[in-house]
């Protein structure tokens, strides 16, 4: 085989270096950008720990596999026969033997290095397994079978499995390498009837096979612990009767056989033949089939299944206890009460309920995003999330009230075609503007047939225009970090010292960012880095990027928290809150496991999927342990990320605090103002309510029979016109209500539960968000000897009521579309009250929903009215709705469009001074538009200043201010 010239070798090496540089360059660039970002949020130790954990684990695993392969190739090559007989002139191995001999160093080192790199890249992804093992924390609970602390299964066993699996890989790769080498160099010959195996080949391969079988013995030993997560029985997770009485002893038997089989392979070194290890291997295989598979199957078929309710009672009892503990639905967290479920109440009993009735929420956060968009924003580059949020605030009189809340965020996807320049997207339209809230229990005025007004939220706005001094005051209403921002929505803020502001703030003013968020762009090197990272040369040539410039990226609050805490699963619905005058995004973080012994395996994504839109879906991964251990906040102005421990007893959180010390702040650092806005998280509640449909049962026999199981009902309003949709679960709803045992209304997350495969209501569950009893779950269990209608039955009843079917304003009207809002189920005076708002949306461009009617159902009676009070009185009688909170606020003009202030008196016209002031405003506006189109920030700042001065002169002359 011809050799390459020195020049060819150099060119080949240079080409390889360039190729590697191109492949690794983007990764190195991304790593440096991440390093800068972690420095911005003050969490570089998180980045460093991940990098060194991955690097260390990858190098160790790669070196282990590579060295084992290298050693075996070297042994096989050094022990090759001196004289190798050939089968003839056309011997196919001769050519390979020649190449391998001439390139022995290339193959001897190159193949192990390549395999080592592949192994290292694969193994590094298990860095979390290593870190949890190194920082294992005891649970203080033991499993019922072996008596091991739960931490053995959650933190230690996965690491032993990791070591075992890579040992298998190393031995297998070494065996294959040795086998091929011996075959090529004549240590193994297939000629003749039985072939020939040289002594060195027999010894080396026997040792490797013996080590492999010895590892299999260890595998059988560890399998015993894995049985505590068995899924043999579809009803529950955990070791079944068959697992305990058949597979458990079988694993020990197979382990012993595997040890003898390994000894047989080692004995082959001295016995000079492979017959004994071959027989031992056959024995191991037959034993694994007969004893490991056939015997358990026979026991299961003929002993367990005919008596399953008795045989599996112990396992079910263990599963019940473990599941309740792992998912936080034990007696210490869940209170189950029998609830009468009355079907008849007097008007006085309803009116006396001053905790729930006055606070019934009429605004649906899943419906009103378009209404918020059209009525509270003036420009196309602002937007709201598809799903609004529900939170609570105290009125000046101390009364707690729930609100629909949202941030008016920047939405670069909404920019018009002539606004799509790079400068506009990344340097002008950099931030949102305002915290928007609306009391959830009322509208501006009642909707009247034939009118265009009424049925709109009563907006309370804190934005730049009013200096953040709305009903809920905000120190700085500018929003630089929000849910509508994706990976490509970076913003460049700041600039050259003394330069005019360029960031759009209002039509009258521009702004220069003054917060601590962002990565400095002052150095040419950083500009070069980001130019390469985003593939954008403007970073290098735009003169507005100066020494004080900074770049903001990773601006989605959920993404920011995920990077800071990669070990957390995050709730899909971040929400904004005003805390001490600052706008904070609050995100719930979960610690999860999938290896808690005997605890029920649950698909996280499936359990949290419902008809809710506008939220992040959870990955459909199995979990059997979950805790809401962390609450995270992201400042909407400066992007700072703070994590707080809210379940400091959680062993998983403690382990991760050992990995990343100081990243999660202790609970004592949570301010009372922040704690007042903590909500019980939706995704955790969805998982828990799903499990409570089964795990409210305490008796193994009842659990096995399923006869008292419940289920989450399908959302009766998911089709938009009512109608059940069996594929979608009804979401839980946040409400402000007072249930039995509470002395005042509290903010809580609630859900109705129906009987299994039935539509009648079986239970109602709520989770408290009140700081005094946060996290406590209450289940109101309805009597089984009566039939209380469930959500779908009530929805059908509501829609078939003559008052509804005969209403041509809302239904069967080609000019409008009726939208059924969330169907709330509320405990009131011993019964269950259903309330559902109905919205209409005109079939016109730029139309938006408005509240038109309220449906109420109780005890088979339906109320249908423009107001909640009217609907209650239709059901219960006069006086029942006197405490309902949906009457228009005092002094509200029912004909005034929402979100607007009453018009002030127009200034006198005709004076020369006024005429000149108006002309100056028009001239200044033209200057602003011209400067925006040109992208000249100096001109833009001067134009804004000119406009501001013209407006001030106009106001001084008696004009209306903005």
Swiss-Prot record:
User: Which superkingdom, per the lineage?
Assistant: Bacteria
Q: Which GO terms describe its cellular component?
A: extracellular region; plasma membrane
**Is Transmembrane included in the keywords of this UniProt record?**
yes
Q: What family does this belong to?
A: Belongs to the UPF0182 family.
Does the keyword field hold Secreted? no
Write the record's keywords in alphabetical order, separated by commas: Cell membrane, Membrane, Transmembrane, Transmembrane helix
Q: Where is the composition biased (Pro residues)?
A: 899-910
This protein's major location comes to membrane
Checking Pfam families in the record gives:
UPF0182
The source organism is Saccharopolyspora erythraea (strain ATCC 11635 / DSM 40517 / JCM 4748 / NBRC 13426 / NCIMB 8594 / NRRL 2338)
Which residue ranges does the record annotate as region Disordered? 707-730, 876-916
Q: Which parts pass through the membrane?
A: 10-30, 55-75, 106-126, 168-188, 203-223, 250-270, 279-299
InterPro entries with a match to the protein in the record: UPF0182
Provide the disulphide bond pattern.
none
What is the protein's given name?
A: UPF0182 protein SACE_1102
């Amino acid at each position: 085989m011809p050799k390459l010239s020195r020049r060819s070798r150099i060119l080949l090496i240079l080409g390889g270096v360039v190729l590697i540089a191109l492949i690794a360059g983007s990764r190195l660039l991304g790593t440096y950008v991440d390093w800068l970002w972690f420095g911005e949020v003050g969490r570089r130790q998180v980045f460093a720990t991940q990098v060194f954990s991955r690097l260390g684990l990858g190098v160790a695993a790669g070196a282990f596999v590579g060295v084992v392969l290298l050693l075996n190739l070297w042994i096989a090559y050094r022990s090759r026969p001196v004289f190798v007989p050939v089968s003839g002139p056309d011997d196919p191995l001769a050519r390979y033997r020649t190449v391998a001999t001439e390139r022995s160093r290339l193959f001897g080192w190159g193949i192990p290095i390549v395999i080592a790199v592949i192994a290292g890249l694969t193994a590094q992804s298990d860095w979390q397994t290593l870190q949890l093992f190194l920082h294992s924390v005891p649970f203080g609970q033991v499993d019922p079978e072996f008596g091991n602390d739960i931490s053995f299964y959650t933190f230690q066993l996965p690491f032993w499995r990791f070591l075992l699996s890579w040992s298998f890989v190393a031995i297998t790769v070494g065996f294959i390498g040795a086998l091929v080498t011996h075959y090529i160099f004549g240590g193994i010959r297939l000629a003749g009837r039985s072939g020939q195996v040289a002594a060195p080949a027999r010894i080396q391969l026997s040792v490797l096979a013996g080590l492999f079988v010895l590892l299999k013995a260890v595998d059988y030993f560890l399998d015993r612990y894995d049985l505590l997560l068995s899924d043999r029985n579809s009803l529950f997770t955990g070791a079944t009767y068959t697992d305990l009485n058949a597979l458990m002893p079988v694993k020990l038997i197979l382990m012993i056989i595997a040890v003898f089989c390994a000894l047989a392979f080692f004995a082959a070194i001295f016995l000079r033949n492979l017959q004994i290890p071959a027989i031992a291997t056959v024995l191991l295989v037959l034993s694994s089939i007969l004893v490991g598979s056939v015997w358990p199957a026979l026991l299961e078929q003929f002993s367990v299944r005919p008596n399953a309710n008795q045989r599996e009672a112990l396992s079910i009892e263990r599963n019940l206890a473990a599941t309740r503990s792992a998912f936080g639905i034990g007696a210490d967290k869940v209170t189950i009460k029998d609830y009468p479920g009355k079907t008849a109440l007097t008007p006085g009993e309803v009116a006396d309920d001053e905790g729930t009735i006055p606070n019934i929420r009429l605004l649906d956060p899943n419906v009103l995003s378009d209404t918020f968009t059209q009525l509270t924003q003036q420009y196309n580059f602002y937007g709201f999330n598809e799903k609004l949020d529900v939170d609570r605030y105290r009125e000046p009189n101390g009364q707690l009230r729930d609100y629909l809340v949202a941030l008016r965020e920047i939405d670069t996807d909404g920019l018009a075609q002539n606004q799509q320049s790079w400068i506009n997207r990344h340097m002008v339209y950099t931030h949102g503007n305002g915290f928007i809230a609306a009391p959830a229990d009322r509208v501006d005025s009642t909707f009247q047939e034939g009118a265009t007004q009424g049925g709109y939220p009563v907006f309370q706005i804190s934005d730049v225009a009013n200096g953040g001094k709305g009903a809920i005051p905000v120190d700085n209403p500018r929003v630089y970090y929000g849910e509508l921002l994706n990976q490509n929505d970076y913003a460049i803020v700041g600039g050259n010292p003394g330069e005019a502001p360029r960031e759009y703030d209002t039509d009258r003013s521009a702004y220069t960012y003054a917060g601590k968020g962002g990565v400095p762009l002052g150095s040419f090197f950083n500009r070069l880095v980001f130019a390469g990272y985003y593939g954008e040369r403007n970073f290098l040539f735009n003169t507005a990027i100066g020494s004080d410039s900074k770049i903001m990226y990773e601006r989605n609050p959920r993404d920011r928290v995920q990077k800071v805490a990669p070990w957390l699963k995050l709730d899909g619905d971040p929400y904004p809150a005003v805390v001490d005058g600052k706008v904070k995004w609050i995100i719930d973080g979960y610690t999860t496991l999938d290896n808690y012994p005997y605890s029920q395996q649950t698909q996280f994504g499936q359990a949290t999927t419902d008809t809710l839109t506008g939220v992040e879906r959870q990955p459909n991964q199995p979990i059997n342990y979950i805790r809401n251990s962390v609450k995270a906040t992201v400042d909407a102005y400066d992007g700072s990320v703070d994590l707080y421990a809210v379940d400091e007893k959680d062993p998983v959180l403690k382990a991760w605090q050992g990995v990343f010390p100081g990243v999660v702040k202790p609970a004592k650092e949570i301010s009372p103002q922040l704690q007042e806005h903590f909500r019980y998280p939706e995704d955790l509640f969805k998982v828990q309510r799903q499990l409570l449909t089964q795990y409210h049962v305490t008796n193994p026999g009842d659990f096995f029979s399923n006869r008292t199981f419940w289920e989450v009902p399908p959302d009766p309003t998911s089709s938009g016109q009512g109608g059940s949709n069996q594929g979608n679960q009804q979401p839980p709803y946040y409400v402000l209500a007072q249930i039995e045992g509470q002395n005042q209304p509290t903010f809580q997350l609630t859900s109705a539960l129906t009987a299994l495969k039935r539509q009648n209501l079986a239970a109602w569950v709520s989770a408290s968000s009140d700081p005094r009893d946060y996290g406590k779950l209450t289940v109101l269990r309805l009597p089984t000897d009566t039939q209380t209608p469930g959500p779908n039955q009530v929805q059908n009843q509501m829609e078939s009521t003559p008052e509804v079917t005969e209403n041509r304003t809302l239904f069967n009207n080609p000019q409008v579309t009726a939208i059924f809002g969330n169907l709330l189920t509320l405990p009131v005076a011993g019964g269950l009250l259903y309330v559902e708002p109905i919205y209409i949306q005109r079939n016109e461009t730029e139309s938006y929903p408005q509240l038109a009617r309220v449906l109420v159902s109780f005890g088979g009676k339906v109320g249908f009215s423009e107001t909640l009070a009217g609907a209650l009185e239709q059901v219960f009688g006069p006086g029942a709705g006197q405490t309902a909170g949906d009457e228009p606020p005092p002094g509200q003009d029912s004909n005034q469009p929402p979100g607007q202030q009453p018009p002030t008196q127009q200034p006198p016209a005709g004076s020369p001074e006024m005429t000149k002031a108006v002309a100056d405003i028009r001239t200044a506006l033209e200057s602003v538009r011209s400067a925006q189109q040109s992208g000249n920030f100096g001109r833009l700042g001067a134009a804004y200043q000119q406009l501001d001065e013209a407006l001030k002169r106009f106001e001084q002359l008696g004009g209306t201010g903005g």
